């Protein structure tokens, strides 16, 4: 069995493959195709339907049916006052499924992008932890030597062992998470999980949002999920209108039929005037007078429409609340990322200071001399601050992309990615 060679995959490629491979997108696409068929089915009742049949068979005695060699019938609706409402309902149903498809694509783009960025972050953290583990092993060796020499209490060795154990535990946890992210991306894109390697250069900066902007207008006009819910509710409202009109307005249909009768059945012996060719054409008018079933159906349709509007309002409110929560969290997450970056800068400066003092001395007569242990601690601290910075930056990116998803723009952001 041949194993797939590792391949670097850009974010653009991952998103594009996920949109092509997604089962939820395929389901939503099938719903759109079904809705198109429903529109055609509802509209085409005005077009005549033609049927051809035959009833050839042996008979004996008095006629019990029509000795038809073959027959042709045609029928269509001429007037149905409810039909325009049903056509409007079908078209709005199609609009709802199209919006649902776009909303599904938005979610696929968000999920794939976040998993990709998270895998890239985890990969960087694992590389930092590998370096941190080397420094921890060196620190553990130094502490062991100092304890053996009797110049350091055993508690310092225990502290170094604890630091090393925490690093190994975190690395094990992140390695397991990276495997899960690769498997998830494999399911989303169709690529082998073991060969999935991210490209950090393909991840662009996420757009910033104004803290004082009103997102409610954006949500009402751009969130496909909310728009789909209202389109579905309006579709059911038109269907309820159509059901209501069926109680009061007549139905007029067109019918035509031609029959070619056989003579070998001897039916002409029993009929005074028998002929082989027979044709009939006319209209059928059905006037509703009293139908409790249709009345109940009307009430059912009206209640269903009211329920759909209430669900659409609830979804709109929930989406607006989620957007507001994300918008308010951006300022805090941005400051947290800034704090983490400053802590990283500080740790790097402290590391440079320690290395300089170990190389040339502090230059102060009364200063406590630094040891290789201080160097390893400074290196470990710098790597930990780097990992914290990665975590803070990811949380900010996740919030921004989630907000883009809420206002219906995350797919536009994905299309702007460089095609590598």
Region spans (language model):
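A glycine-/polar-enriched beta->alpha junction
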Residues: 16-26, 33-48, 72-89, 99-106, ...
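Amphipathic alpha-helical coiled-coil segments
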Residues: 27-42, 104, 108-128, 138, ...
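Small/polar, glycine/serine/threonine/aspartate-rich low-complexity segments that form flexible
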Residues: 51-91, 199-209, 253-290, 417-420
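Bacterial Sec-pathway N-terminal export signals of envelope proteins
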Residues: 3-51, 55, 91, 153, ...
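Acidic, glycine-rich loop-and-beta core segments that form the ion-binding/anion-interacting portion
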Residues: 215-261, 279
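Periplasmic alpha-helical coiled-coil/stalk elements that build and connect Gram-negative outer-membrane
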Residues: 9, 107-222, 326-333, 360, ...
């Amino acid at each position: 069995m041949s194993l797939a060679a590792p391949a670097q995959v850009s974010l653009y490629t991952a998103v594009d493959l996920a949109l092509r491979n997604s089962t939820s997108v395929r389901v939503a696409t099938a719903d759109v195709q079904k809705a198109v068929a429903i529109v055609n089915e509802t509209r085409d009742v005005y077009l005549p339907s033609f049927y051809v049949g035959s009833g050839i068979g042996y008979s004996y005695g008095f006629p019990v049916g029509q000795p038809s060699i073959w027959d042709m019938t045609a029928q269509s609706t001429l007037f149905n006052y409810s039909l325009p409402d049903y056509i409007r309902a079908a078209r709005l149903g199609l609009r709802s499924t199209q919006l649902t498809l776009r909303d599904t694509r938005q979610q696929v783009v968000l999920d794939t992008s976040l998993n990709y960025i998270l895998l890239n972050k985890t990969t960087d953290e694992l590389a930092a932890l590998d370096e941190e583990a080397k420094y921890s092993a060196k620190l553990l060796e130094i502490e062991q030597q100092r304890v053996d020499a009797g110049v350091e209490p055993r508690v310092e060795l225990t502290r170094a062992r604890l630091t090393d154990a925490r690093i190994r535990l975190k690395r094990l946890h992140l390695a397991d998470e990276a495997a899960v992210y690769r498997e998830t991306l494999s399911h989303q894109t169709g690529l082998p999980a073991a060969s999935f390697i991210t490209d950090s250069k393909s991840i662009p900066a996420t757009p910033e949002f104004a803290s004082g902007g009103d997102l409610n207008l954006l949500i009402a006009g751009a969130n496909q999920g909310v728009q789909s819910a209202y389109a579905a509710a309006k579709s059911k409202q038109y269907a309820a209108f159509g059901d209501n009109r069926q109680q009061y307005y007549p139905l007029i249909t067109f019918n035509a039929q031609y029959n070619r009768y056989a003579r070998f059945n001897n039916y002409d012996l029993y009929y005074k005037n028998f002929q082989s060719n027979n044709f009939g054409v006319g209209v059928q008018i059905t006037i509703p007078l009293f139908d409790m079933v249709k009345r109940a159906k009307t009430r059912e349709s009206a209640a269903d429409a009211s329920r759909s509007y209430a669900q659409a309002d609830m979804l709109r409110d929930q989406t607006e609340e989620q957007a507001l929560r994300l918008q308010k969290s951006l300022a805090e997450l941005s400051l947290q990322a800034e704090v983490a970056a400053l802590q990283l800068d500080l740790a790097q400066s402290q590391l440079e200071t320690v290395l300089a003092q170990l190389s040339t001395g502090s230059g102060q007569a009364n200063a406590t001399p630094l040891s290789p242990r201080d160097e390893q601690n400074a290196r470990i601290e710098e790597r930990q601050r780097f990992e914290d910075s990665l975590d803070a930056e990811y949380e900010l990116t996740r919030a921004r992309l989630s907000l883009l998803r809420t206002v219906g723009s995350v797919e536009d952001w994905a299309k702007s990615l460089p095609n590598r």
